[in-house]
């Protein structure tokens, strides 16, 4: 299965994926191998839930390793020194006024592979992220959301 999709990422995002990959290849693989050995020592595999669970975990981890390797191989890393402060782009940190909640929020615009809404890292492909891309300080955007339309004003763009 060859996936040649390009993954737009920040250098920080690449580093996190590399760290996760290293952890899975070293620590996690070793843990799973040990679980399989212990489960095999119980004998009969036909009713060995520990063995089945360890093999399922192994399959998940190996799948994630393949996914991470592919993402890193096809990463298109955004050079922070080339990020314009004139308009929002991947890598920008955007201070916006959220008119729905009357609050100021900082969004870090990242590629989809490193999006984490809990840390206000939003994908350039998300509704809010894609609406912000290319906009300038002072622009007001209206973004369709499940509850209607959300309104944001761009207050600041930084790296």
From Swiss-Prot:
GO terms for biological process: DNA-templated transcription elongation; regulation of DNA-templated transcription elongation. Necessary for efficient RNA polymerase transcription elongation past template-encoded arresting sites. The arresting sites in DNA have the property of trapping a certain fraction of elongating RNA polymerases that pass through, resulting in locked ternary complexes. Cleavage of the nascent transcript by cleavage factors such as GreA or GreB allows the resumption of elongation from the new 3'terminus. GreA releases sequences of 2 to 3 nucleotides. The keyword Transcription regulation applies. Belongs to the GreA/GreB family. Keywords: Coiled coil, DNA-binding, Transcription, Transcription regulation. Residues 14-76 form a coiled coil. Transmembrane segments: none annotated. Pfam families: GreA_GreB, GreA_GreB_N. GO terms for molecular function: DNA binding; RNA polymerase binding. InterPro entries: GreA/GreB_C_sf (IPR036953), TF_GreA/GreB_CS (IPR018151), Tscrpt_elong_fac_GreA (IPR006359), Tscrpt_elong_fac_GreA/B (IPR028624), Tscrpt_elong_fac_GreA/B_C (IPR001437), Tscrpt_elong_fac_GreA/B_fam (IPR023459), Tscrpt_elong_fac_GreA/B_N (IPR022691), Tscrpt_elong_fac_GreA/B_N_sf (IPR036805). This is Transcription elongation factor GreA. The keyword Cell cycle does not apply. HAMAP family: GreA_GreB.
């Amino acid at each position: 299965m060859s996936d040649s999709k390009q993954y737009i990422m920040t250098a920080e995002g690449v580093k996190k994926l590399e760290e996760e990959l290293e952890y899975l290849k070293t620590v996690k693989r070793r843990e799973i191998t040990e679980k399989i050995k212990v489960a095999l020592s119980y004998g009969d595999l036909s009713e060995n839930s520990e063995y089945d669970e360890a093999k399922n975990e192994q399959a998940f981890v190996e799948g994630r390793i393949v996914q991470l390797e592919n993402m890193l191989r096809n990463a298109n890393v955004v050079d922070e020194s080339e990020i314009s402060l004139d308009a929002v782009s991947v890598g920008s940190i955007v201070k916006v006024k959220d008119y729905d909640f009357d609050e100021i929020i900082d969004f870090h615009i990242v590629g989809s592979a490193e999006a984490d809404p809990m840390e206000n890292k939003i994908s350039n492909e998300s509704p809010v992220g894609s609406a912000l891309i290319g906009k300038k300080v002072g622009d007001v955007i209206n973004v369709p959301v499940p509850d209607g339309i959300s309104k944001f004003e761009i207050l600041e763009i930084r790296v």
